[in-house]
């Protein structure tokens, strides 16, 4: 084997090893991302909603910094209600839905799926009507979310 081929093979192996450390998103979060794109045809990447304010992203505490952050707080509470009512895991719950223009519409069977889908649809619609303020992206949550 030529040395150049060995280098390419080594590079592929190293990159695959690095990629194996990146955890995949739960499928529900991927669905939620598509739902956000449906409701909100803005050009902002969905990833910008993952680290916004005190509630958009993992966890959440304190007072929401604005209307958009409040959407995330309500979404978190909705998922908490799904866990209590239906003993399901919202982040792992897949559901069926369609996009009609800018309106996500849930058409799923089980109570848990329907509830989680409605949580996501309401949040996506809330995101669409709430202004995005760059100053609230990637904030110091320890200082601002008390």
UniProtKB/Swiss-Prot annotation:
Location, primary (coarse class): secreted
Cofactor(s) listed in the protein's UniProt record: Ca(2+)
Residues the entry annotates as binding Ca(2+): 55, 57, 59, 76
Record GO cellular component, one term: extracellular region
Annotated cofactor note: Binds 1 Ca(2+) ion.
Record SMART domains: PA2c (SM00085)
Name this polypeptide is given: Basic phospholipase A2 paradoxin-like alpha chain
Biological source species: Oxyuranus microlepidotus
């Amino acid at each position: 084997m030529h040395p150049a081929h060995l280098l390419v093979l080594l590079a592929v192996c190293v990159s695959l090893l690095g990629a194996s450390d990146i955890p995949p998103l739960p499928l529900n979060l991927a669905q939620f991302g598509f739902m956000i794109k449906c409701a909100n045809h803005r050009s902002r990447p969905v990833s910008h909603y993952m680290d916004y304010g005190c509630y958009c992203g993992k966890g959440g505490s304190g007072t929401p910094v604005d209307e958009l952050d409040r959407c995330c707080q309500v979404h978190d509470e909705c998922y908490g209600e799904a866990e209590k009512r239906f003993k399901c895991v919202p982040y792992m719950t897949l559901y069926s839905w369609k996009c009609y223009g800018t309106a996500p519409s849930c058409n799923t069977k089980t109570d848990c799926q329907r509830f989680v889908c409605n949580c996501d649809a309401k949040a996506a619609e809330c995101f669409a009507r709430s202004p995005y303020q760059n100053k609230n992206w990637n904030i110091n949550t320890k200082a601002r979310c008390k």
